[in-house]
């Protein structure tokens, strides 16, 4: 378990209709170390989690129990961000997606920010490294993102089979950096494989909602419900 300073609140949309549902959700999450408190709003189908646990761990645990979940906000206002990580190789978008990972980011103290990094669909197994580059210009892939601004020490072990294709690989890690959120917005988040063959994916770090800042059920832009948008996201490998 991490230090108390690493605890943060996150809200999730989870289908629920009664106390039997919330009891089942509690049972699903019971075995996860690091959860301090769970709160439920059945009328809004929202769950609040105070923990030091990666959001991907919460979501995957619920999916293993047959329940879907969408993270709706994390941390205090202006303390969260996200980066959708894409490959810059040629991809037939009619059959595939360029998305190969996701970084969910939340600041937990003045000089500590947590990064929940998921990689899914890389062609080579092994250790991948994460780093932040100085700018968010991904027009030419990683080579146009500028100098390395911060490099994480902990690798991401990508040795699990990807659910995109059995010949591809996936991995996850929960890492931290002594950087505030405001200093990350607009920069690029890069995952790369050292050695040969080399491989990298990247995305621009963008601000996301803090806890209880996003409780909409229908998107004003598309008219789709959050669950319809969730299906679209899953099709595009955003999990």
Curated annotation (Swiss-Prot):
The UniProt note on the cofactor reads as follows:
Binds 2 copper ions per subunit.
Q: Which cofactor does it need?
A: Cu(2+)
Disulfide links within the chain:
28-65
| Predominant subcellular localization, coarse grouping | cytoplasm
Protein name listed in UniProt: Superoxide dismutase 1 copper chaperone
Tell me where in this chain the HMA domain is found.
7-70
GO biological process terms on file: copper ion transport; removal of superoxide radicals
Keywords from the named record: Chaperone, Copper, Cytoplasm, Disulfide bond, Metal-binding, Zinc
**Stated family:** Belongs to the CCS1 family.
Q: Does the keyword Cell division apply?
A: no
One of the entry's Gene Ontology molecular-function terms is: superoxide dismutase copper chaperone activity
Q: Per UniProt, where does Zn(2+) bind? A: 163
Q: Where in the cell is it found?
A: Cytoplasm
Q: Which GO terms describe its cellular component?
A: cytosol; mitochondrial inner membrane; nucleus; protein folding chaperone complex; superoxide dismutase complex
Q: Where are the transmembrane segments?
A: none
> Is Plastid one of the keywords UniProt gives this record?
no
Listed binding positions for Cu cation 1 are 18, 21
Q: Which residues form the signal peptide?
A: none
Species this protein is from: Candida glabrata (strain ATCC 2001 / BCRC 20586 / JCM 3761 / NBRC 0622 / NRRL Y-65 / CBS 138)
Function (record text): Copper chaperone for superoxide dismutase 1 (SOD1). Binds copper ions and delivers them specifically to SOD1.
Extract the InterPro entries matched here. Answer: HMA_dom (IPR006121), HMA_dom_sf (IPR036163), SOD-like_Cu/Zn_dom_sf (IPR036423), SOD_Cu/Zn_/chaperone (IPR024134)
Q: Where does Cu cation 2 bind?
A: 219, 221
